Design a protein with these regions (language model features):
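A structural signal for multi-pass alpha-helical bundles of membrane permease subunits
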Residues: 2-184
């Protein structure tokens, strides 16, 4: 959409930005009803589908695509490349760090999400990490909480995030900086 010129392009972006301004809690009831109508409550599919689209991701990747020099896109068009080929061979390599950054940020957000998964799941086998930690915390009751175990569980829960960041650190920093790959 960034490189295509069509009528209503600005209006489409405005609609996307308005949806980004909606509080997440305002979407809980409509999303719950949609998942219930499709029998996706308390399923992994419901958890995945409900978090698969991100308005923040659309905005982040749009901004990254806007950093790609239009001369490179025009050169690919002159060479006869299709829109998909331009995306695959020109735009994606130049914005790879933004994709990795978005993937890492999405994983962290989903990993830490507590409210939405607790609304659509009631089976402890399908709990997300934050729900599992809370149930582990609640099991001890008000006076029987084993704080050493809760803190150990919290430390273990952070390990996958640290590993992912360690592997993606180079691209994460580049994605935030907005490197376009053009010198001069």
């Amino acid at each position: 959409i960034v490189f295509m010129k069509f009528k209503g392009r600005g209006i489409l972006f405005g609609i996307i930005m308005v949806t980004y301004m909606l509080p997440t809690a305002a979407t809980y009831i409509p999303s719950y009803i949609i998942l219930a109508n499709h029998q996706l409550l308390n399923t992994y599919t419901g958890l995945i589908i409900s978090s698969s689209v991100s308005i923040f991701g659309i905005f982040l990747l749009r901004q990254a695509f806007m950093q790609v020099p239009s001369a490179m896109v025009e050169a690919a068009q002159i060479d006869g490349a299709s829109h998909f080929r331009i995306l695959h061979l020109v735009v994606f390599p130049m914005t790879k760090s933004s994709f990795i950054t978005f993937g890492l940020m999405s994983f962290i957000a989903s990993y830490n999400n507590y409210m939405w998964p607790s609304l659509i799941t009631n089976d402890s086998d399908k709990y997300m990490v934050s729900q599992g930690l809370r149930s582990f915390f609640i099991e001890g009751g008000a006076y029987g909480t084993e704080w050493s175990l809760v803190m150990a569980a919290s430390a273990v829960i952070v390990i996958p995030l640290l590993i992912m960041f360690a592997f993606a650190q180079k691209w994460f920093i580049d994605g935030i900086g907005g490197d376009t790959g053009v010198k001069g």
